[in-house]
Structures are given as C-alpha cells and as structure tokens.
Amino acid sequence: MEKKLSIAIDGPAAAGKSTVAKIVAEKKSYIYIDTGAMYRAITYAALQENVDLTDEEKLAELLKRTDIELITTKDGQKVFVNGTDVTEAIRTDEISNQVSIAAKHRSVREEMVKRQQQLGEKGGVVMDGRDIGTHVLPNAEVKIFLLASVEERAKRRYEENVKKGFDVNYETLIEEIARRDKLDSEREVSPLRKAEDALEIDTTSLSIQEVADKILEAVEQKSR
C-alpha cells in the first residue's frame, strides 16, 4: 500500500497555492488543509466582535473561544466559525487586507500551528500557507515553494475577484499584494521563507495544471 505523505505548499499571497493544493489533494485522495482560511476566519471573527487586530492579547483570547472548522463537501471546502458558514465572507478585500496583521502575532500563530499540526499528524494531507514547510510540518516528505511576480499575482487575484462580481482595481491589488509580501516576510514569528529542502516553482508563466503536475511528479518520486 502506498504510504500517505504530508505535502507542504508555501508561497506569498496569490501565488496559486490553494488552487494547486486542491488539485493535488483530489488527485491523491488526500485531505486539503487551507491554513490561510484559518487566519482569515479569526480575522473575520475579530472584525465581527470589534476586537482590535493589533491587540495580541485580546485576539489570542478570542481565538481560544473560536471554533474553526474546515469541512470538505462535494462543492469544495467550507469554512465554519462557531458553526456558521463563512466560506465566502472570509474572501472579501476587507479580510484580505487585514489578515497579515492578525497572523503576525506570536500567540495567535502558536495556537494555529498547534491546531494545524493536529490536523496533519497522520499524513495524507496537503497543507498550504506561509510557514508550513519551515514550521508547521517541518518533517513533511514533500515541500514546495511557489513563486510568481507581484504583477502576475495581482492579475490572478483581479480575475478571481471579477469572476465573483467584486469591484476591484488592478493597481490597488498590486499595492496590496506588495504590502502583504512585506508584512509576511518581515514578521518576527514564522516569516514567509522557503524551507531549505523545498522544491521552488516559479508559476508566473505556468498554468495551474502544469504547476500541479510538477508537484505530483515530486510526490511520485517520494512515494517510490
């Protein structure tokens, strides 16, 4: 029987991590864990309860009493906060622009990492985020680091938002993504960086399927 591996996919905002991770998980019949959605969920909960995102203590306290569930359905993964479906609500620009603030706090990340490690401990998972290969699943058999230019990532996010009917400005998206890159790579706790043993894939000129195929190839090599 083929060993069930842990697959870590890291990279900056809008590099195509979750789209690719879902394809890989489906192909391998693995569980997909979107760690970014977990940080978005606590950001959403904080905004709902008027908790200041810069107040680490209050945010950590809110997280302790917030139940975040990732549930796989036939329509894809659903995200629930305290039993309420927030799958669409956590994908707005308001959340996207503030999630890095919530994610930079040490106590918030420690609690999230604990939850993520529990989800990934048995293998057979594809987990994507910013610090999966370096911090959450440092022993993952397959580690991937996705890259793409800021312009390409802004273009993808723009097309994604237009499809959803959101009113967006391409230039604004470039600025927002560059700002998130800065926040993610400069934060003190688990900054965005490539694990030493990760396979780096520049996705700028590749289709989503081509990226997924490269990852699946790496998985096959490790499974032998």
Curated annotation (Swiss-Prot):
Its EC number is 2.7.4.25. Coiled coil: none annotated. The keyword Plastid does not apply. Gene3D superfamilies: P-loop containing nucleotide triphosphate hydrolases. InterPro entries: Cytidylate_kin (IPR003136), Cytidylate_kinase_dom (IPR011994), P-loop_NTPase (IPR027417). ATP binds at G11, P12, A13, A14, A15, G16, K17, S18, T19. HAMAP family: Cytidyl_kinase_type1. This is Cytidylate kinase.
